[in-house]
Regions:
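A common structural junction motif
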Residues: 91-99
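Short S/T/G/P-rich N-terminal loop/turn motif that feeds into the first structured element of a domain
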Residues: 1-53, 81-84, 103-165, 177-181
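Short connector loops at helix/strand junctions that flank enzyme active sites
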Residues: 67-71, 100-102, 131
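A structural feature that tracks compact, well-ordered secondary-structure segments
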Residues: 24, 63, 73-79, 88-90, ...
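Long, hydrophobic/aromatic-enriched structural stretches that serve as scaffold segments
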Residues: 45-79, 83-84
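A short, glycine/Asx- and small/polar-enriched loop/turn
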Residues: 68-70, 180-183
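Catalytic micro-motifs at enzyme active sites that drive phosphoryl/nucleotidyl and oxygen chemistry
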Residues: 8-9, 58-64, 92-93, 121-123, ...
Length: 187
């Protein structure tokens, strides 16, 4: 079976999508490799990402110099958690994969908002990825859930309206309650 077949096909008709934000730390030993070796390893890694990108959305971001626990992040959006796991396995089998260690991994799922049907998450749009992304796990307080639903809905509508004032910002809210330690992942 080829790597393309193992990763599988993305179905665009599914309404359930899974999101994975994987941050990777690069072993300092990587810097000691010769330039030709690093270049070949980078080509191998990028080739793998290109193949996987035909089966799911993958967005890559550099965190170099911005975080001390990661040099890059992969944001995967797929109709299957297994596709993400296959890609992770394949990453670790590459030359570069021998020099990376995951520092943080967040898993979440898409779901229609309880509060508004006016929001289409940025990841669901057929647009190229933005140059920058801010990713953060979010936990709502117990007090939030004790508020009446209509009050929460109104506050969320106000929040959405503020976001609409900045069309260059895309909202990406996904749900991780019961999957991970946070209620939501925001990007």
């Amino acid at each position: 079976m080829s790597s393309t077949e193992e990763i599988g096909k993305t179905t665009t008709t599914t309404s359930q999508l899974y999101l994975n934000f994987s941050f990777f730390k690069v072993d300092p030993k990587w810097r000691w490799l010769n330039e030709i070796g690093k270049e070949e390893a980078a080509k191998e890694f990028l080739g793998l990402i290109e193949v996987a990108s035909t089966k799911m959305k993958i967005r890559t971001y550099s965190t170099l110099g911005l975080r001390d626990d990661a040099e890059f992040m992969l944001w995967m959006i797929s109709d299957s958690i297994e596709k993400m796991q296959i890609l992770a396995s394949k990453i670790y089998s590459t030359v570069l994969g021998k020099y990376v260690e995951p520092s943080q991994i967040y898993l979440s799922a898409s779901r229609a908002s309880l509060y508004s049907n006016k929001v289409v998450p940025g990841f669901a749009m057929d647009e190229p990825p933005m140059k920058y992304v801010i990713v953060y796990p979010f936990v709502k307080s117990r007090e939030w859930y004790l508020l009446p639903f209509e009050e929460r809905r109104k506050m969320m509508e106000e929040h959405i309206m503020v976001g609409r004032k900045f069309p260059q910002v895309r909202l990406n809210t996904s749900y991780s309650f019961g999957i991970d330690d946070q209620d939501f992942m925001l990007a």
